[in-house]
Amino acid sequence: MVNAEDLFINLAKSLLGDDVIDVLRVLLEKGTEMTDEEIANQLNIKVNDVRKKLNLLEEQGFVSYRKTRDKDSGWFIYYWKPNIDQINEILLNRKRLILDKLKSRLEYEKNNTFFICPQDNSRYSFEEAFENEFKCLKCGSQLTYYDTEKIKSFLEQKIRQIEEEIDKETKLWGK
């Protein structure tokens, strides 16, 4: 069985790539708040690179920070920590984002008419087909009407499925 930290790291990797994982691992291993400078020293990389990675992680909800002002210099000091307890919320937000994209795509499919090249399967909106006299830009073949009912049906099914998952998880986790 996969432990929570591995799941957390794998989720971050799938959303943000390998670049940020070193910073996330250091925070998870430390188990307490760390400054960007402490992380940079431990990884032996530039503080600016650490800050970029932390900001990417923060945008997706993987880490959070608190800031205090240094009494001597007046500069802000940021203390970072992993939000491993927020993994369900991160997944839920990701599903909501996917749901929005699927709904947008469904609207696009419903509001447009499409044509397809029988040779290379290039798909064109009515406007594109009209501008090109209903000929394929790649091979010059005559375009034919493309029925999008299967695509719309598939999108509607996926939208219902994700909405049900979000509803179930929202009730389960109270988010």
Curated annotation (Swiss-Prot):
It comes from the Archaea. Keywords: DNA-binding, Transcription, Transcription regulation. Disulfide bonds: none annotated. The keyword Protein biosynthesis does not apply. Residues 4-88 form the HTH TFE/IIEalpha-type domain. GO terms for biological process: regulation of DNA-templated transcription; transcription initiation at RNA polymerase II promoter. Gene3D superfamilies: Winged helix-like DNA-binding domain superfamily/Winged helix DNA-binding domain. GO terms for molecular function: DNA binding. Transcription factor that plays a role in the activation of archaeal genes transcribed by RNA polymerase. Facilitates transcription initiation by enhancing TATA-box recognition by TATA-box-binding protein (Tbp), and transcription factor B (Tfb) and RNA polymerase recruitment. Not absolutely required for transcription in vitro, but particularly important in cases where Tbp or Tfb function is not optimal. It dynamically alters the nucleic acid-binding properties of RNA polymerases by stabilizing the initiation complex and destabilizing elongation complexes. Monomer. Interaction with RNA polymerase subunits RpoF and RpoE is necessary for Tfe stimulatory transcription activity. Able to interact with Tbp and RNA polymerase in the absence of DNA promoter. Interacts both with the preinitiation and elongation complexes. HAMAP family: TFE_arch. The winged helix domain is involved in binding to DNA in the preinitiation complex. Belongs to the TFE family. This is Transcription factor E. It comes from Saccharolobus islandicus (strain Y.N.15.51 / Yellowstone #2) (Sulfolobus islandicus).
